[in-house]
């Protein structure tokens, strides 16, 4: 009885509360560059105890504070593609070299904002869940993120009052507005003991947002870029598929669907019909490139990043739960397949107008060399969207905001267009992953969007202009290493908040110990009383109950005794109840193509697939919106 009581106590929420920021601190990272280590935290946070659902995060503290604190939550897409893409190939402070050493990203977004990368939904990247418990809809994705943030801010309260921005790319164009709406609703119904989360803006790059506007844009883009020539046999076949797609898009209820199978076949067939005699096809993420997988092995950094993240010492540095370090893959097609099994929620295009009208700024940006979520589709959805009393970029009826040419450090970079709290930026010569191609330009863009004031930071300003007019100063990658006076004041506030958080965690841990000792003492007292009545001696027999049934008293009790047995029992699952990310390197090598062999990712299909369609693209792969 006593053993079971103590196990119940240790598994209570109080024990979970005892976890603190210190448990997630990253002391060092393999291959780190010379110089002081950036302040980082990483690890798993439980979001669903019933399904063993845990989300992995990697957090980087900002290097400077410009007038106020900001946090950017970054999500990659898929669904089922890891946000480590964003951390190590796009906006994070490090890039991985061939020899697994890390170099600084000169355009990292952590210069003036805290960065929080989260692998989600559960089962993505380093996150995990029981294999029969993958998510199927966007509402559950948003609910898990709210749970994650509640727990994360409880451990890191110094960031809870930061201006909050949510950013990402591709299928995150669905995640981000749904999560933002959940935050807005939470703020409206806030409880007395909760803090308001100041959500300020959303940034979506080459996002999948509006099926009605973006499916037809695939063929439009192919014609515009000369991938397909109108009037040819290939064009006629594709036109027929597009006609069927258009019928589906206009069918009753189609406006509430994120995935439409018939429309997805346009891109699949386009890639098949344009494959060359030497088995090369267009890279759907960058049409300037061709390979046998249609972009599945792109970008080039993916190989070394995958090997790096599978290293045991990297997993240990990132505080991964036991057994979770070996199985990282960029995109988990089991997450993708399960997400497509049912109606996964309304398209995010239905949420954007309300979010903008509630005061949340939105920035959409596109690389003009991307096919799979191309800029024509994004421009079409903006043109047709109605919000704040107007349609598209109207400034007044019949008058649209102009496109303003953008130059960065003397080169034509793209253009800006803005109206009524929505900004659109087109990047010239950029792929699906714009920050991968142009980290400094995207840093300039994000600093302007989040209203960074660098007056007290120092460093030569970047030369960024719209229509030749010099913009307010930003300093991309050139800030001084010293901390400004504003930094010092805010640093003191952060340390005070951190100390309070650690104190709170310590108090919770002390409560656990006190209650545990009290319960233990009560049962010992009861045992002695019973022994006195029965005339027996309260010897070791009274203490045997501390151990679980069937566990020998001679088992080790050194620091890991009872607790380690409790963990082993709670973490053991039946052979059928495997965890989504719980496999080792040997198992990875034996996976079939349907289960993400090596570094290839499953091409994403917006809609369901037939079994006999597995070979539609790139030797059995469909394009991921990663």
Curated annotation (Swiss-Prot):
Listed InterPro entries = AB_hydrolase_fold, Peptidase_S10, Ser_caboxypep_ser_AS
Gene Ontology BP annotations: apoptotic process; proteolysis
Q: The organism sits in which domain of life? A: Eukaryota
Key word S-adenosyl-L-methionine present: no
Indicate, by first and last residue, each region the UniProt record lists as having compositional bias (Acidic residues).
607-616
Span of the secretion signal? 1-18
Q: How does it sit in the membrane?
A: Single-pass type I membrane protein
Q: Which reaction does it catalyse?
A: Preferential release of a C-terminal arginine or lysine residue
The alphabetical list of record keywords is:
Apoptosis, Carboxypeptidase, Glycoprotein, Golgi apparatus, Hydrolase, Membrane, Protease, Signal, Transmembrane, Transmembrane helix
Q: Where is this region: Disordered?
A: 460-489, 558-582, 606-626
Q: Which residues lie on this side of the membrane: Cytoplasmic?
A: 526-626
Q: Which residues lie on this side of the membrane: Lumenal?
A: 19-504
Positions annotated with a glycan in the UniProt record: 106, 421, 429, 478
Positions of transmembrane segments = 505-525
Q: Give the first-level EC class, as a single word.
A: hydrolase
Disulfide bridge map = none
Q: Name one GO molecular function term.
A: serine-type carboxypeptidase activity
Q: What compartments host this protein?
A: Golgi apparatus, trans-Golgi network membrane
Task: Return the Low complexity bias intervals.
Answer: 474-486, 564-575
Query: One GO CC annotation, please?
Result: trans-Golgi network
Its Enzyme Commission number(s) read 3.4.16.6
Q: Which residues form the active site?
A: 170, 370, 432
* Keyword Hydrolase among UniProt keywords: yes
**What is the protein's known function?**
Protease with a carboxypeptidase B-like function involved in the C-terminal processing of the lysine and arginine residues from protein precursors. Promotes cell fusion and is involved in the programmed cell death.
UniProt lists the family membership as follows: Belongs to the peptidase S10 family.
- The protein in question is named Pheromone-processing carboxypeptidase kex1
Q: Which species expresses this protein natively?
A: Talaromyces marneffei (strain ATCC 18224 / CBS 334.59 / QM 7333)
